[in-house]
């Protein structure tokens, strides 16, 4: 089974093409976890780096026409070297341009997983869910949204919210761990996309277990951070979350996981 120990042993190089707001937080989070991040954004450099990579994250948060071309180039190179790519279609339900870019990347390039909140994933499959920018309202049918997207795209899907859902090959599991402090720190969702990219390629054919482990590690680390002194304050939580990602073990995951 995919484990945190395996990630630390392999220390996969993860290329993160992510939004400008969260680059530092993302890099520090991956280092704490045990992965090796690179924030490269130039196609010639990506050609050199991706041949050694264990994962690629495409996060469309700070979207421009130039970045769209960069995403396309990176995904072409990743497919060339069989590097699993994860798409985070940030705010794709908030406007036509973002939806157009997300649709292009999903329909024309090879993806190993898509990670988004309920509003984002629902917009990709035409389900009506209230969404405001990068945030979405709580929904009761998050597992149905995950399954609908998995069926439509035949790609593993992670839908995040108060409850998280993972759908792979028509099978769905829900994760009931996490911290209410996470939405109060900008970048926690974006870092999660990078964590998913770190785990997804560890074991071929074990995508469901890999995604489940990624989500549990991340969410339980959030619970650990919130319980620490002043962890209920967003500034302290941000620091303690990085610390928790560094300290969490497979034993913690086994003890505290809540999966249905």
Curated annotation (Swiss-Prot):
Its EC number is 2.7.1.50. Gene3D superfamilies: 3.40.1190.20. GO terms for biological process: thiamine biosynthetic process; thiamine diphosphate biosynthetic process. InterPro entries: Hyethyz_kinase, Ribokinase-like. It comes from the Bacteria. Pfam families: HK. Pathway: Cofactor biosynthesis; thiamine diphosphate biosynthesis; 4-methyl-5-(2-phosphoethyl)-thiazole from 5-(2-hydroxyethyl)-4-methylthiazole: step 1/1. It catalyses: 5-(2-hydroxyethyl)-4-methylthiazole + ATP = 4-methyl-5-(2-phosphooxyethyl)-thiazole + ADP + H(+). Substrate binds at residues 39, 187. ATP binds at residues 115, 160. GO terms for molecular function: ATP binding; hydroxyethylthiazole kinase activity; magnesium ion binding. Its cofactor is Mg(2+). Keywords: ATP-binding, Kinase, Magnesium, Metal-binding, Nucleotide-binding, Thiamine biosynthesis, Transferase. Disulfide bonds: none annotated. Belongs to the Thz kinase family. Catalyzes the phosphorylation of the hydroxyl group of 4-methyl-5-beta-hydroxyethylthiazole (THZ). This is Hydroxyethylthiazole kinase 1. It comes from Streptococcus pneumoniae serotype 2 (strain D39 / NCTC 7466). The lineage of its organism: Bacteria, Bacillati, Bacillota, Bacilli, Lactobacillales. The gene is thiM1.
